[in-house]
């Protein structure tokens, strides 16, 4: 028994050594890890090679659909918004609300950063929000640390709940229950992190003076909606809705405290809506496709292909949800939003090709790691 236990740890030990100690590129380390896991299963656990290979293939397919499909779509929407110049409008809007750097950190790094992470994932929030904070006068290292800390809870759901949905697929757990449990685990951290961000901004606990209530509500305003949304819809929307509520609550309390919010120069309401249109559409489409709208949900989920890839006993059902997949909904939102923002179909196609080029190594990494996990499960 102990021998089997030790052999089962070999793939995990390899990943720890190759990634954490040697510093090997993730794509290479995970691919070698997959090969080691297959050899381990066949030679040490006496699994039929055809079963082992089909289990790995199931994981690779899962890595492509839905994981990389969602990542592709999320990065496409983000890049569309950037290329059209709309991201600049959003950044200007957020930075015009107050001159208090502590509150700006709550709005930009915490609220907007959480929103970007829930839409695009990939640590996009850290890069974008750190750049905004640096332009507003924060030191580069300070801004980077603040954004990394702010992103610590948002990554639990990633882009449209992808990590939780993937965990549900791999473990055969209910994704709605899993999403709800994750939000409950995060509640204390979600309330605590805004206080840490304010302290990091002011470089002292005294930085909380005068904005303790705003800081508290910035966290509570994210935590409560996350729990409620996860309870009734699943893992796709909690981070997105929670971050939006946090921004709204923080801005509203700031307005009450200061008595006014600066106007955004040269930007009307229509321009702001235009800039946010892809994200608004993502929210609407994902909401309509959820179990909250049974007629739409039933129609979209009816267009599904069921695969049984594993050739051994008790194979998992691998559903390919062509219409209800978050990737399809996000892509559609990006295309419509891109048209609203004035981009042509040819421009959007070029954006899509560029995104495909950038995620090549990531695709290899994800497919290898999910394939590895599936072999270990079977």
Say what each PLM segment does.
Residues 104-209:
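Hydrophobic transmembrane alpha-helices that form the pore/transport pathway of multi-pass ion
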Residues 1-7, 190-314:
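Long, contiguous bundles of hydrophobic transmembrane helices that form the permeation core
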Residues 45-53, 86, 119, 161-176, ...:
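Transmembrane helix-loop junctions in multi-pass membrane proteins
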Residues 53-136, 342-378:
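Membrane-embedded alpha-helical segments and adjacent helix-loop junctions characteristic
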Residues 7-16, 24-46, 68-74, 215, ...:
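Hydrophobic mid-bilayer segments of alpha-helices in multi-pass membrane transport proteins
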Residues 242, 261-378:
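Transmembrane helical segments that form the transport core of multi-pass membrane transport proteins
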Residues 16-17, 38-42, 114-115, 166-167, ...:
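Alpha-helical transmembrane segments of multipass membrane proteins
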Residues 1-10, 63-67, 118-125, 177-192, ...:
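Structural signature of hydrophobic alpha-helical transmembrane segments
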